[in-house]
Every structure is written in C-alpha cells, then in structure tokens.
A protein has these predicted regions:
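Charged, compositionally biased interaction regions
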Residues: 1-185
Length: 185
C-alpha cells in the first residue's frame, strides 16, 4: 500500500482526523460521560492505535474520569492499549507535558489500573508470541488545587519576548508552558 508506513504517515493523519471525533462522540453521547473536552490519539511511532489521551474539565468527578478511561480502552478493540486522563492545561501532543502530568498529578497506587485479556490487534511483531496483551489506564488529572506554575505570568513573558526580539537576539521557539498560570491554589 502506498500510504501504509510507520506513523506519522498519510494514512495515520487521515485516521486521526476521523477517529478522534468518533471517540469523543462515543464518550460524550453514547456513554453520557460528563466533563470530556477532547480525545487525542498519539501518532508518532504508535500509529494512533496504542495510546489514547482523554482531556477533562478541571471539575470532572473521579467517577466520570474512570468511566471514560474504561470506555476509551474498550471502544475499539485495536485502540487504547494505554489510556491517559489529563486536564485542559496539558497539551496531549506534547510528550513532556504528559510526563509532567504523570509525574506530578498521578499516584500510581491510586491512579493506575492494569487490565488483562486484551487482544494484540494489528501492528508489528511483539516481543512475546502470545495472543493476549493488556491495558494500562492512568488518571493524571489534578486531584485538587495546586500551586501556580513556577514561571512568570503571560504578560511578563510576552514583554520579555518583545524585548528579546527588539534586541535582535536569535529567534525564540516557545514551548508550552512558556508562562506561569494558576492551578487553583
């Protein structure tokens, strides 16, 4: 096939645009889960099928988060091997932001579940030859108010960026988060 390669590829971009709204509609409409803002399917190397990120409003109850994690994991048999719940301030396309959320907002004993008896689905040969795989669900959402992000606020950073550019210094490439913001505390 001309469009089947290791992701990102033409086919994975097309699938992502098609699948993400379908997953979102499944969680919101079919399952009636409140607080779901967005569903993102991780593309580079995983090819959309293995890692799913569900973005929630800050005030979403824990019960709704777990309903969505299970719902995303089992909606489509070959998708959702790893499902991560995050809040709106986390960019699901930024692996550093996801790792930060997992490191600071997740307690593995309370916020991680592993589920067995998952089919392997389509993909490259695995390390083991068995028929079964497993699922990993992670709640990396805020469990309460947190201190503000330890960076100057947006007006200060924007002014600093303007001064930087006025001085003719090398072009900046800001990455989120590039300014501090309130996390409720």
């Amino acid at each position: 096939s001309y469009i089947s390669q290791v992701a990102p590829s033409e086919s994975s971009v097309i699938k992502r645009v098609a699948y993400e709204p379908v997953f979102l509609a499944h969680l919101r409409s079919s399952l009636g889960i409140r607080g779901v803002k967005k569903v993102s399917l991780h593309e580079p190397l995983t090819g959309l099928l293995r890692v799913t990120i569900v973005t929630f409003e800050k005030t979403t109850p824990k019960t709704e988060i777990w309903r969505a994690l299970y719902g995303a994991a089992f909606f489509k048999g070959d998708c959702g091997k790893i499902v991560i719940a995050v809040n709106e301030d986390i960019d699901p396309d930024n692996a550093d932001a996801l790792l930060w959320a997992m490191a600071y907002r997740m307690n593995p004993v309370a916020d991680v579940r592993t589920l067995d008896h998952r089919g392997q689905g389509h993909g490259p040969k695995r390390e083991n030859d068995g028929e079964e795989d497993s699922t990993l669900l992670m709640d990396a959402t805020m469990k309460g108010d947190m201190p503000p992000l330890a960076l100057p606020t947006q007006p200060y950073m924007e002014r600093s960026k303007a001064i930087w550019e006025e001085m003719g210094l090398p072009k900046l490439r800001p990455q989120a988060p590039w300014f501090g913001y309130s996390l409720g505390d």
